[in-house]
A protein has these predicted regions:
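Active-site neighborhood of phospho(di)ester-bond hydrolases with catalytic His/Asp-centered motifs
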Residues: 5-7, 28-34, 52-57, 73, ...
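Conserved catalytic scaffold of divalent metal-dependent phosphoesterases
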Residues: 5-14, 59-149
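Binuclear metal-dependent phosphoesterase catalytic core
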Residues: 6, 15, 64, 77-81, ...
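Active-site environment of divalent metal-dependent phosphoester hydrolases
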Residues: 10-14, 35-41, 57-63, 93-97, ...
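Short, conserved loop/helix-junction motifs that constitute active-site signature segments
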Residues: 23-24, 44-48, 153-157, 180-182
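Active-site regions of enzymes building and remodeling cell-envelope glycoconjugates
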Residues: 27-29, 48-53, 66-76, 177, ...
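A short, gly/pro- and small-residue-rich
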Residues: 47-58, 147-150
């Protein structure tokens, strides 16, 4: 399965003819946040692939104007094309009273509240996050620190891959690194865009099928569900 992952910076080349070919080649499109609703909605016009998104720390407008035709994975495990995708958007809290920012303790509580959902799903295959892991591709300033609680989450559930954004290439002073690893699991900064192919060893057969617990606002295909 060929996955196009997006984050933070709209990619100009995706608006042209080359971009249309890139979109058509994708089996699945994932957004790690901080992208305009119109940008994600545009993608759905040129691809039959599902577009799955979470919130970045600047995406407070998604509540009133969500991306049309896209699957919202924020705070849930969603089953799309046999992949169990866990969505944990937002950044570390560096301003008060912003609903897309969380303290370390708040993010840890979010994960704890998902335990029952994770059990029903039998785990997850992809962690779709906005922020990185603490100490792994994050930065020293408060606004761009990662979350420590992502480490035990990955080690316990052993997903295929984690995608995130938030740390822009322009912020990294020539030290930008897209692909890192935590406990043997690839951790990829998808800022701008990144194309990823699932390993041949992955199989959707382990993903359980269950009825959606609530209706998804999406152009969902059969089998695309909330757990």
């Amino acid at each position: 399965m060929h996955i196009l992952v997006l984050a933070d910076d709209p990619v100009q080349r995706l608006w042209g003819e080359y971009g249309k070919e890139t979109l058509k080649a994708a089996d699945l499109i994932l957004s790690c946040g901080d992208l305009p609703s119109s940008y994600l909605s545009y993608m759905t016009c040129f691809t039959s692939a599902p577009v799955v998104y979470i919130h970045g720390n600047h995406d407070t407008g998604y509540e009133t104007r969500p991306p049309e035709g896209c699957v919202n994975a924020e705070g849930h495990v969603v089953l799309v094309k046999g992949l169990r995708i866990l969505g944990l958007g937002g950044s570390i809290r560096y301003r008060p009273d912003v609903p897309t920012m969380f303290s370390e303790e708040e993010m840890a509580r979010r994960i704890q509240k998902l335990r029952r959902e994770l059990k029903r799903a039998g785990g997850f295959d992809i962690l779709l996050a906005h922020s990185p892991i603490a100490g792994l591709g994050d930065q020293e300033d408060l606004a761009h620190r990662g979350f420590e609680c992502f480490k035990p989450l990955l080690s316990e559930y052993r997903p295929v891959v984690m995608f995130h954004g938030h740390v822009h290439q322009a912020y990294s002073a020539g030290k930008f690194q897209r692909v890192r690893e935590w406990d043997g699991i690839p951790v990829i900064n998808a800022c701008g865009s990144y194309e990823y192919d699932l390993p041949d060893t992955w199989s959707p057969s382990g993903a359980p099928t269950c009825f959606a617990r609530r209706k998804m606002k999406s152009r969902a295909e059969p089998g695309d569900e909330h757990f």
